[in-house]
């Protein structure tokens, strides 16, 4: 995969990766942070919880995300954003579907990427990062890299086969199917159409859309806390 994430994310934001240039020195870190929180679609409770866990829980795992980023060429803040959405950085997180840990890894995925102990945060973070990198490399959907990244995030949440089948319903030539088109299709789809189960009235298709949006929000907040300013005229996802 080389440096595809490094190139892509640098092109979408200012100083998203270690090698990117810092933002305009006339803009303070406080201004960047305030602006990013104001633009976030998260509610106040979610914002406050994120800030609390960023201060009191995340530091324990920062080096693990750095190591996973180096091993996979995926930017650290993106991995940390995925992990926050998955588990709120709780190494013992688990769901009734059997997924566990920081990146909520399944048994099948653990076997694929060599994770022996899913509740081991370092193994889980590196395993989830490897799996995400595999999904991105294998993804054939999307005319742009921005589309491909959003579609890969949806695949991490909903499963790559399900997302591929949705894309095929839109166009047999899936490489021309955009994330916007997939979102429009997912909104109309119930769980049974995806061989999944809806939770009450919350459809699995809508869950995948919300998942991508929330990872985007958390990514931008993590970048802002690192004194990194996304370009307002560009959309990350």
Predicted feature residues:
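N-terminal export signals and maturation junctions of secreted/periplasmic proteins
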Residues: 7-11, 18-66, 91, 225, ...
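Second-shell loop/turn segments in exported
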Residues: 48-55, 65-68, 91-93, 111-122, ...
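Extracytoplasmic
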Residues: 60, 74-79, 84, 97-100, ...
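Secretory-pathway/luminal and periplasmic proteins that interact with or process carbohydrate-rich
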Residues: 87-96, 135-138, 158-170
């Amino acid at each position: 995969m080389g440096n595809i994430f490094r190139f892509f994310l640098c092109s979408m934001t200012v100083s998203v990766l270690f090698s990117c240039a810092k933002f305009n020195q006339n803009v303070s870190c406080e201004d960047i942070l305030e602006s990013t929180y104001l633009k976030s679609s998260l509610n106040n409770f979610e914002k406050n919880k994120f800030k609390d866990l960023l201060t009191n829980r995340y530091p324990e795992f920062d080096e693990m995300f750095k190591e996973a980023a180096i091993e996979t060429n995926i930017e650290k803040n993106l991995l940390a954003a995925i992990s926050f959405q998955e588990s709120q950085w709780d190494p013992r997180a688990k769901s009734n579907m059997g997924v566990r840990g920081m990146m909520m890894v399944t048994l099948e995925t653990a076997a694929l990427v060599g994770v022996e102990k899913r509740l081991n945060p370092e193994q889980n973070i590196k395993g989830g990062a490897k799996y995400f990198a595999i999904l991105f490399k294998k993804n054939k959907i999307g005319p742009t890299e921005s589309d491909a990244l959003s579609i890969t995030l949806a695949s991490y949440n909903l499963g790559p086969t399900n997302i591929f089948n949705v894309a095929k319903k839109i166009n047999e030539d899936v490489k021309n199917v955009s994330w916007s088109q997939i979102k429009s299709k997912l909104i109309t789809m119930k769980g049974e159409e995806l061989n999944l189960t809806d939770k009450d009235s919350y459809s699995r298709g809508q869950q995948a859309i919300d998942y991508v949006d929330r990872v985007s929000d958390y990514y931008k907040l993590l970048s802002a806390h690192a004194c990194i300013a996304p370009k307002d005229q560009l959309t990350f996802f």
